[in-house]
Regions:
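Nucleotide-activated donor-binding/catalytic signature segment of Leloir-type glycosyltransferases, i.e.
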Residues: 238-258
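Membrane-proximal helix-turn-helix segments that form the acceptor-binding/catalytic region
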Residues: 107, 133-149
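Short hydrophobic beta-strand element within catalytic cores of glycosyltransferases
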Residues: 295-299
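Aromatic "clamp/platform" in nucleotide-sugar-dependent glycosyltransferases that forms part
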Residues: 93, 278
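N-terminal strand-loop element at the rim of the active site
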Residues: 7-14, 20-21, 27-69, 162, ...
């Protein structure tokens, strides 16, 4: 069983989609899976290709053109090498790489899988709809509807896939979490409580709600500080800094882009991570924070009801009032209470989201698609 996964770009700056794809593929190889990845080199000269030079990563010169990102290099490689693969699996929709993967699979009569990575959420489809509508009519509606399976990371995403109209099998397999090297940094038991955001700076992340929540703490503001970790749209970052200045907040720090082990060294120092986004398909940062014992507050636009069920955080509306309420709860919690909450989160991640367990589910899915085994319990049919 030989699998080809494809993705439009594989640069570190692409964020969660590339990271979770790399983590899954690495775990698949450790499980004995025969999986290759086909992608294009990053166009941004400041970006770098993820990975460590693995032979299974085929990164082609990036010759993509037009908003559709047509690539003659990608097409040429597929034309030459397609016959050696049993299943094709693409990560995402809307770009030529995704369409070409689906077309090639249909041409060969081989099964293909699409991991939608949240791109069929209503809010995601609405963004740049003027670009997506003609592409949907021309090719992507067919690509999606004729897929042998769509991969969703949570039940919420599957519901949006069904609402889109897809009636084929949907596999719910979470994004994998590679448990990090234990950070050397520690949360200060006696210092200020630290609240944080880590992710791409974009208006839909609603980072400003942290500032509005902090402003509501009034005289208790001095008991805490906020770390904003990430980069993104320059105009949005400027807006955030202007809001901090307008509100007169003195305890907000912008730390810039962090990744790798540095990310975990920062996360472990937080008293709580806040994810106040409009929506998140999965939200890798949630499992990353939980994996080092940091409680998380995530908005109802994320699929993280488990935070409430497992008592390792807060899943609630991301209004400034609710954020302020969570901040006050954390300020009133002892170090022991925070540590116990963090340990529950860490245990949940290790039990349900560890990369090797996720990779095993993906291998089960591939085997089932090739008529080798029973339908897995995580595959849902209409």
């Amino acid at each position: 069983m030989k699998i080809l996964q494809t993705i439009a770009e594989f640069g570190a700056h692409w964020g969660g989609i590339t990271t979770c794809t790399y983590d899954l593929l690495s775990a698949l190889h450790k499980q004995g899976g025969d999986v290759d990845l086909l992608t294009l080199l990053p166009k941004d000269s400041t970006d770098r290709l993820l990975g460590n030079g693995e032979e299974w990563i085929h990164a082609l010169k990036n010759d993509s053109i037009t908003p559709f990102a047509y690539s003659a290099n990608f097409k040429r490689w597929l034309d030459i090498n397609y016959s050696q693969y049993d299943i094709l699996h693409t990560n995402g929709v809307w770009l030529y790489v995704h369409h070409a993967t689906c077309v090639m699979a249909r041409k060969l009569g081989k099964p293909y899988v699409i991991t939608t990575h949240g791109m069929l959420y209503p809010d995601a489809i609405k963004r740049s709809y003027w670009k997506k509508w003609p592409l949907l009519k021309l090719c992507f509606h067919k690509d999606i509807m004729q897929a042998d399976c769509l991969h969703a990371t949570c039940k919420q995403e599957m519901e949006h896939i069904r609402a889109f109209g897809y009636k084929g099998p949907v596999a719910i397999i979470p994004n994998p979490m590679v448990l990090p090297t234990p950070p050397s940094a520690k949360r200060s038991p006696k210092g200020k409580k630290v609240f944080g955001f880590l992710g791409r700076l974009h208006p839909r992340k609603k980072v400003e709600n942290l500032f509005y929540g902090l402003e509501m703490l009034k005289e208790r503001q001095d008991e805490c500080e906020i770390w904003i970790m990430g980069s993104g749209l320059p105009e949005y970052e400027s807006f955030l800094k202007s809001e901090v200045k307008k509100l007169g907040l003195k305890n907000v720090k912008f730390l810039g882009f962090v990744n790798g082990q540095e990310k975990y060294e920062k996360l472990v120092q937080l008293s709580t991570l806040f994810v106040p986004s409009d929506f998140e398909n999965f939200g890798m940062i949630v499992t990353e924070a939980l994996s080092v014992g940091t409680p998380v507050m995530a908005s109802l636009g994320t699929p993280w009801e488990e935070l409430n069920k497992q008592h390792c955080g807060w899943w609630c509306d991301r209004t400034p009032e609710n954020i302020a309420k969570v901040m006050l709860q954390v300020l009133d919690m002892s170090s022991k209470e925070l540590e116990e909450m963090g340990e529950r989160g860490k245990a949940m991640v290790e039990e349900n989201y560890a990369a090797m367990q996720v990779a095993n589910k993906m291998l089960q899915l591939y085997s089932w698609l090739l008529n080798d085994g029973e339908k897995p319990s995580f595959v849902y049919e209409v």
